[in-house]
Amino acid sequence: MARRGWRRAPLRRGVGSSPRARRLMRPLWLLLAVGVFDWAGASDGGGGEARAMDEEIVSEKQAEESHRQDSANLLIFILLLTLTILTIWLFKHRRARFLHETGLAMIYGLLVGLVLRYGIHVPSDVNNVTLSCEVQSSPTTLLVNVSGKFYEYMLKGEISSHELNNVQDNEMLRKVTFDPEVFFNILLPPIIFYAGYSLKRRHFFRNLGSILAYAFLGTAISCFVIGSIMYGCVTLMKVTGQLAGDFYFTDCLLFGAIVSATDPVTVLAIFHELQVDVELYALLFGESVLNDAVAIVLSSSIVAYQPAGDNSHTFDVTAMFKSIGIFLGIFSGSFAMGAATGVVTALVTKFTKLREFQLLETGLFFLMSWSTFLLAEAWGFTGVVAVLFCGITQAHYTYNNLSTESQHRTKQLFELLNFLAENFIFSYMGLTLFTFQNHVFNPTFVVGAFVAIFLGRAANIYPLSLLLNLGRRSKIGSNFQHMMMFAGLRGAMAFALAIRDTATYARQMMFSTTLLIVFFTVWVFGGGTTAMLSCLHIRVGVDSDQEHLGVPENERRTTKAESAWLFRMWYNFDHNYLKPLLTHSGPPLTTTLPACCGPIARCLTSPQAYENQEQLKDDDSDLILNDGDISLTYGDSTVNTEPATSSAPRRFMGNSSEDALDRELAFGDHELVIRGTRLVLPMDDSEPPLNLLDNTRHGPA
């Protein structure tokens, strides 16, 4: 029995060979696999976290390095402005005859740009540049998948093939090159606004017809003359094989509009220092102010030229008239928007008590003025035109509602901003000659451009002056015409228009050539202004307050009659309705509006208008006097003017009362009583009035 008990059992395949055993072992295998994968994942996650931390450290270092470089770039511009200010101070003591501070600011910019371009190189490890990415188009935004993470890259611009090995240096130079919108949204508004806010309106409106002719007709003539000449140059370049890209007639016209924007800031600064004849100063200043506005609207109209059909560069009559309509619409809309913003600011300052809080008053004035530019641009108009007429409106109405402290603050604030912005732009021009990456210089185009701007300026000044002299009592002399021809400098506006779009080959060539034109005109014409004044025998040292003393009596009366004919309706409307509505002065609206408007008139009339406590302080306005009872008060003395039919005019100081009145209207502050309304008319806030009767002034300048 025992032997059978030790019987040899057959050999088995294994413990889990049975189905039941396999079912029991399956969970064990699953647990083991999960453990292995968890361990591998933990190891992989640790490496990923380490790589992520390394990437964060590298990003922080790059951000810190970029911040330091940006600070250094801004410091460069601050030092340039500081050096320019010190140079101006030096020139106040020792004037360099053939060099103005604006030209020297450009030289400073050139030197700094030269050092940045050729003297400083960025180490290759600062920027990680990959040159193996190839796409068929140039999208504005590029999303790149890097190890499962998506990164956003923005388009900065085209780099020529011969500069691929210097991308690091290009990146450094690109950082000192501002976005063109910075010029239009930050630097141009204070310059243009100050031109309108500080406008000497008496001289401006006296020559308004001539200024409008030079600004509108002259700019259009200059644009088409330059565009036609440049199209001939471009055709010659195509024939000789010098043209490497497309250049159409519309591009030539656009270039003509760009370089037709004159900016004689250097000449006007010298005129102001030497006290050049006020008529010449008014013509040049008025033309430059409106010329900038016309040039920018004209360039926008040319860009908007879109003829029907596939070829957008052929001549089409319908498209031409459409562009003319766009020009008129943009200009008139911008004018209306600028004037409306000034009116709104005047109403706010009149019907609130902000004058009790000068800081808030100045802040509101500043923001409303600057927002005019941005509002016009956002609505598709031109901010330059809007902010110019906003400045004129603010000076005519809002300025009178401000407190005395705010009046000084606003004038000084915008004068400072204008000074810094102008000098910054001139310094930046010199810098851009070396830091801009896509310059295109063509000798034929450059020479043709210089010939074109001289011929365009001549076609503007001389024919229009001949036509204007046919209807002017005070003729524009040949020496004035030669000086206006000589003073056609190009500056900040031409530079800003040219740099705004440099995407195509044609625009790059236009920008590079415009830069050379600005350098040449500022250095040569700006530096030769004093010598040209002497050569043309133009009067200097002329006090604007004394300009009428040497004018014959019959010419003064003729000028007065012409002014009355041109502006009588406007001045009556302005004096009787607009100034009482928008300021604290003038006759109450209850006396000028119809009786049915009594409630509205009482609501809109300021209490000061009834009490005659707040006087109208409209600097540099020109009053048109009609026949009637007019008395001019000098302290305790009063001069009365008689109607034109009076046969026995009173004599005062050896002259007729009308002569005394004409002299006094040309200078200083005085009190004028017209039909019971007291009105202060400060004619020039920059110079004290003549003390003809040893009396003191009645109001502040």
UniProtKB/Swiss-Prot annotation:
GO cellular component terms attached to this protein's record = early endosome membrane; endoplasmic reticulum membrane; intracellular membrane-bounded organelle; late endosome membrane; plasma membrane; recycling endosome; recycling endosome membrane
* Membrane-traversing stretches: 71-91, 103-123, 176-196, 211-231, 252-272, 278-298, 324-344, 372-392, 414-434, 436-456, 479-499, 515-535
Keyword check for Cell membrane, yes or no.
Answer: yes
Summarize tissue expression. Answer: Ubiquitous. High expression in brain, skeletal muscle, and heart, but is also detected at lower levels in most other tissues.
What does this chain do?
Answer: Endosomal Na(+), K(+)/H(+) antiporter. Mediates the electroneutral exchange of endosomal luminal H(+) for a cytosolic Na(+) or K(+). By facilitating proton efflux, SLC9A6 counteracts the acidity generated by vacuolar (V)-ATPase, thereby limiting luminal acidification. Responsible for alkalizing and maintaining the endosomal pH, and consequently in, e.g., endosome maturation and trafficking of recycling endosomal cargo. Plays a critical role during neurodevelopment by regulating synaptic development and plasticity.
Listed under GO biological process in this entry are: axon extension; dendrite extension; establishment of cell polarity; monoatomic ion transport; neuron projection morphogenesis; potassium ion transmembrane transport; regulation of intracellular pH; sodium ion import across plasma membrane
Can you name this protein?
Sodium/hydrogen exchanger 6
Annotated compartments = Endosome membrane; Recycling endosome membrane; Early endosome membrane; Late endosome membrane
Q: Describe the effect of residue 218 to R.
A: In MRXSCH; decreases protein stability; increased ubiquitination; impairs acidification of endosomes; reduces localization to recycling endosomes; impairs trafficking to plasma membrane; reduces uptake of recycling endosomal cargo
Instruction: Provide the alphabetized UniProt keywords.
Output: Antiport, Cell membrane, Disease variant, Endosome, Epilepsy, Glycoprotein, Intellectual disability, Ion transport, Isopeptide bond, Membrane, Sodium, Sodium transport, Transmembrane, Transmembrane helix, Transport, Ubl conjugation
**Catalytic activity of the protein:** Na(+)(in) + H(+)(out) = Na(+)(out) + H(+)(in); K(+)(in) + H(+)(out) = K(+)(out) + H(+)(in)
Q: How does it sit in the membrane?
A: Multi-pass membrane protein
* Effect in UniProt of substituting residue 568 to Q: Does not affect post-translational maturation; does not affect membrane sorting, does not affect pH homeostasis in recycling endosomes, does not affect cargo trafficking
- Glycosylated residues are 128
